[in-house]
Structures are given as C-alpha cells and as structure tokens.
C-alpha cells in the first residue's frame, strides 16, 4: 500500500522576513539611522508641496533626566508633526531649552565644596552653570531622539545663546520704550530659601500646609464722624477684631480694611481672654464668632461699613495710630471677622488699598526672611520660624489676642527649594500689564484653545493678574540692561543704551555685562559720564526668557513663522509659558504668538497618584524603552509602545501609566504587528502593477472590505485633524482585531492558501490586502513610526517611495463608499457572530474540533435577508465566484438555509437571536487532505482520491 499523497507544497503559505517580534531595542535605532542617513525629515520639511507648519516648542528646563511628562509632551508634538508631514506640509520643528535660572544655579552650587564657593564670582558661577545646562541639554536631546522625535536637532534654540539673548533684549527694549517696564517698591512673592523674587509660575501650593491663625483686637481710639454717636458709649473698651494666618506680618500693619457693602456690629463679650469688653465685627458673623471665641457675643449696635471709614485705632504692639479703610471685594464673611489686617508691604490687595489712600510701604524683613531693625523688638527673628510665636505671646501679654488655632490652607512654596515663600516689598522691575491687558484679552479670543476650557483658564488669569515682576536677584540669567546713577539711584534706560547692549550681547553673549567696563557697555553719548553710573545686578525672570521665544526663534529664523501654528504644553502653562509668551507678544506686536494652543494633563501612576521618589511609583521612560535591571519585571518595550500609550490616553486630563497599562499596550501593539505580518506574508507573490483586480471585478466581500477601509481611515484622519489621538488608537485597534483578524482575514485564509496562486479568487483578496497594508502603515506612522517604517521596508513589491513618510497620507477612493452594502454586511456579520456562538457550544462539548467539522443550519425569518443569503449559498462549490458564499463567511464545510425552526431545534447544538436561528450538525462527506473542508466528493478523483472538488480544480488552475 502506497503512502497517501502530500499536498503541503501545493498550499500558498505566507512568506515574509518581517519579524513577529519587534526586537525594538535593536531595530528602532536602525530605523532611526535609516531616516537620518536618507534625511527623510529634512527633505520633507523643505520639499513638501503644502505651506509651512510650525509647532513652536515650549522649552523644557535643562536640568535633570527626562521623565514621563517629557515623554508625553514631546511625543504628542511629534505625532502632530509627523501627521502634518504625511499630509504634505513643510513641517519645521525647532526643539528648544530653557537654560537660565535658579534651579541650575542651585545644582552648580550644590556640586561645589564650601571652599570653592568662597571665591566664586558671578562670572565663574555663570561659566559653570552654562556647562551644566549644555551637558544636560545634550543628554535630553539624545533621549528625545530615542523617543523617535523628529526635528532640527542640529540647530535647537537655547535661551543662553547670543542670538536668543539679543532678541530677548529687543523685546524688553520695545516694552520699555512703550512705557510698560517700570521700577517700583512693591510686595512680591519672595523666597527666603533662594533669596530672590518669584513669579506666580514659580510657585506651587502643596496640600497640607498649616498656619497659625489668630484673631486679635486693636484698640479703637477715635470714632469716624459718621459713627461718633454710635461708638462713643463703648470707646474706652472697644477693639476692632481682625483675623490673620500670618501673625508675622502684624509689625507691617498700617490699616484695617472693611467691605462697604457689609453691615458691622458692636458686640459685647464677657470672657476675660482680652482687654476689650466690646468688639467690632461683621454683623453676619456674630453667631459663628460666638462659637469660635467660646463666649456669647451680644449685639449692642449695628452700623453700615461705609460709616466706619477713617475710624482710628492704635497698633497693639507699637505706639502707632492707623485708620479703618475701605478694602475691595476680597473682604468677605467667608472666614475671619469681616475686617482685614492690612500691611501694604506684605500683600497685593493690601498694597492696592495702601496706594489708594497714600499709605507708606512698610516691609521690615530682609532677603533671608529675618526682621530688620524697623521691626524693633522683633529684629533678628525669622518670620517663617520663631517670629509668629514671639508676636502671639506679646499680643497675649497686651490683652489683644482673642483666639489662636491651626489653619490648613493652600500656601505658596518655592517650586524649586520646596520651602514656603513670603510677600515682601522690595525694589523690583515690573512689566505693567495694565497697559496692554485689554489687548491681551482680545488676543486670547482669536486663538483656538484645545480643550476649549483652556480659554476659560487663561482669561481670568490675565484679567486678574497683577503687574509682572520680571527681576531676579541671581547671577545665572540675562541681565536687565540698566545702569543706576551713583548719587540719585535713578535708572538709565534709553533706546540708545538698550540698542547698544543688544548689539554687544548679539556678538559676545550676556557674559559681556560682567566682563566689560561700564564705559564700554554705554553708547558713545554716555561714555564721558561712565564714572557716574553702576551696573544693575538683577537678571530677568526665566519666564521672560522663554516668553520671548516667539521673537528669538519663530520670528527671527527665516524658515519659521510668527505667529506659530500651535503651542502645546501641560495645563500648568496657562500661568506659565502660554501667558508669558502672550503678554510679551501682545505688548510688542498686539497679537497672540500662536494660532492654536493645545494642553495636556499630568502623568500619574496607575492608581491616580502623583509620581514621587518617596512613593516609589516613578515610571522612567528610558526603562520603558530599554528595560530595567530585571528585564523580566521591566521588559524593554521600545519607543513605539511608549508612543502607543500617548495615543491611547485622553491627554486633556491627567493620564495614568504603570506596569499593567504597559502590558496591555504591548499586547495591542503585538496584535497590530501580527496583523501587519499576516498581510505582508500573503502578498509575497503579488505585484500590484500586473496582479491588481479592478473594483468592478471584486467579489462583494472585498468591496465591503474596501468600504470599511474607507470608513476606518476617514475616522483616523478626522482623529488626527482634531488632535483626538485616542480615537486613532481605538479605531486602528478595532480595525486590526475585529475587522481584519477576526473577520476578513479569518475568512480569507481559505482563498489565500488553497486557491491556485494566479486565480482571481486569490488575487482579488491580495488586492484588498495591499490596499490595507499600505494604508495601515501610513495611518500608524505618526504614532507607531518605527513599526510603520518597518512594514514599509518589508513590502514584498516595489513602490516609488523610499520611506513610508515619503509615500504621503492614506489613499482611499470615493468609489469604495457603499452604505447599502455596509448595511447588509452588518447583518451578515451579525449572523456570523451567532454561528460562532453555536459552534463554540459544539466545540466545548468536543462534538467538533475545527469549525470545518460542522454543517451549519440557518433559519432566517426576515424574507429580504433570506433572499440575499440564498444568492450566497450556491448548489455546489464550483459555481458562483468562489468567494461570496455563506460557508466561507462562517468557516463551515457546508451551510443549509432551512424553512422551519424545527430543523434548528432538532440539531445537536443551536443558538438563537432576533436575526437568525443557528443549528450545528456534523459535516457531510469526508475530510479533504488539502483544505480540511468536508465534502461528499472526496474519493471521486482517481489521481487524487483524498481531496475535494475545489482542491482538484485549484491544482489545475481552475479555482
């Protein structure tokens, strides 16, 4: 007896060298080298046919390693840029770095021994700081490139370069000449820990700050004209009650502020905690304050707030008289007493009241946060350490303290040193926002904000903000180009002095301020008086540095444009870079520096917690890409999985990441890759030039698939156009898994493997596969750039395009759209799902192994659908187009449309829905050795007795 014939070599199995495993650690750098060697980005950014597109980079700080926030931010930018490149835009992306400022200065100082610090001149410190910033910038650039980010890495912008600094001086100069820059004694956020003024954007408000809050009474010594009659009976024992969370500011008290729209009451209190039998408080607060003071307060008289204006009180700690004055709407009954202790040297609102009434500015605190001699008995005490205790004790002794309690609230901390700040009045340079606030608010309305609530965030910030303190008392920064008259202390700041400094900085950089003499730094007309001047020692706020990038980069570089198309940063930048850029641009040019502003949230761990070393929950992007020390626990996923994560999240709010999420994304990545591999493998012998089947000749299944491809890639395009990348993620995942793997490719295997290689049955399927793989590669390219390029390099046929990125965006045809076809195939897919349920029941009972072991019975009550299905169920396998058949759609050897439910109920296994009732019985005939389908014709062919009629025809080229 002879061995049965083997048909293994007659089956068209997939062939491709496209690896199932990404091997990203090795492969991704190879693909990045391919892009670099072929200058793909450079050529596209110059030669693309559409207009220039500029996403202007918000500069990360050149300090420390890259973290997940960097990864989210830079990848989002790169997704947009790569999409725009594929759409034919000349994308010009110049990465930038913020290089000045305190954090770098502190890092440098911390790295030095105390002996080294002793002889440290500003110039030496600046050289060390520059070296540190440049080294960090190089390391960060390497990391960004490994993420797959494209840009002009050879010519980044750094805020420390001469050309940048000179352009920034230009912005400062134009603002100064318009009268927007002034010097003044004003309370500013002051950091005693770093001994400099801070901008709002340099503050953070950690949870859990507890202050010592006090209620105190100041003795009334003279009633105002309007209250004489009412207050006279109580005067000798009357105090005005105030509340404060900063007792240390009491030495600076110069007024008490009230709300003119509130009513106030004189109340009697009968405890002996303080010297005053009678107190003035807001009438609405009497009940609450009775509870707080733990004593009954009895109302003796009420009076309108306005009437109390100019009532005189004595300071409880000094022999100093002050007045009760009208404050603003910040005086409320939400907390406190309805009367606010006012120290114009220690608060913005207090300062405004002081200005209105011509009060002085008393701020008896030095740069380290210690009281000066002006505070008399408290001189030398530190306001954040021991001052509160001493002041509270003295108030107690004087009989002024009503109550002390702990108060938990948000309090500003220095974002770098993580230590509390204070309000302190100092001589500083300011940008007067008042002069261009309305123009800024108008400019905000011209911008597209994504998400839309971004506009609601930045608008009140700009409309409510105080003047911008732009000076810093540090060495590592761009010097404010001002000279002071030695005798009068008057600043010298003119168009000529600014222009002269700008020219010097453009050539030599800002070190020249320290290196050159005053005479050399002054223009000709002032040189003779050089001996009368000294240089200023203040540097500019780093937010003025980065906020000038529109001028130093977007406007200055000829290949870019201003305003930029888009700015994209974290939501904290509404009070940071978005705002500083807006203010400088509006001040100088009366326009916003951007057309669109897109913001993203922060990266949290899987449980929604902030990442911190102390919690041990930090996810390192480098570990995601290259793996950790223990590669079993922290496998190397490569940059594409990281990029896929970025596309998967709704970045408009805070986004989680962790091991479980990465594992899930890795699985999805693998599914997309395996789908691509199947497509490539089944195109190994396909040449689109000669083997493509025309649309008219395609079977209905293939035409339906082209309709789905049109739907899918229209949705993907819209997702990118609207920056909703999570829609791209969901659509592509669904397309690869549900439309392709679980449906079309599942059905296609029979056509691809067992048909004659040249048959239209196979070539029509390959036509669809080629369209699917090319469009899939292009569609994933903005996100999974490495996988997309890898796919393109393994296309088994020639294309005119060297790279997926030079091939342009997805291409579909209007001809493929067919909504009627789509509706009828939605029903067929519903039937297929129901059949799968019934087959699964049979499989569980071990009645069948493969679905090909089954014959499927279908009962379809809807007449139209039944008629449609009948045309998909030819009498035998060799009539029809060999594709549009129910048996192939449901992966069974035979299908019978039955006339009654009884046949279904008599079947071994059944499943029912409104659409269809399904029965499963054993397939008829014998199993074909070649295609594994059952057929009653197996055994009829003398030369090939073990195969079916389809395979017999396929072997001679007829199927």
Curated annotation (Swiss-Prot):
A motif ('HIGH' region) lies at residues 60-70. It is found in: Cytoplasm. The gene is ileS. It comes from Crocosphaera subtropica (strain ATCC 51142 / BH68). Zn(2+) binds at residues 928, 931, 948, 951. It is an enzyme of class 6 (ligase). Transmembrane segments: none annotated. GO terms for molecular function: aminoacyl-tRNA deacylase activity; ATP binding; isoleucine-tRNA ligase activity; tRNA binding; zinc ion binding. Keywords: Aminoacyl-tRNA synthetase, ATP-binding, Cytoplasm, Ligase, Metal-binding, Nucleotide-binding, Protein biosynthesis, Zinc. It catalyses: tRNA(Ile) + L-isoleucine + ATP = L-isoleucyl-tRNA(Ile) + AMP + diphosphate. The keyword Hydrolase does not apply. SUPFAM superfamilies: Anticodon-binding domain of a subclass of class I aminoacyl-tRNA synthetases (SSF47323), Nucleotidylyl transferase (SSF52374), ValRS/IleRS/LeuRS editing domain (SSF50677). This is Isoleucine--tRNA ligase. ATP binds at residue 613. Its EC number is 6.1.1.5. Its cofactor is Zn(2+). GO terms for biological process: isoleucyl-tRNA aminoacylation. Binds 1 zinc ion per subunit. CDD domains: Anticodon_Ia_Ile_BEm (cd07960), IleRS_core (cd00818).
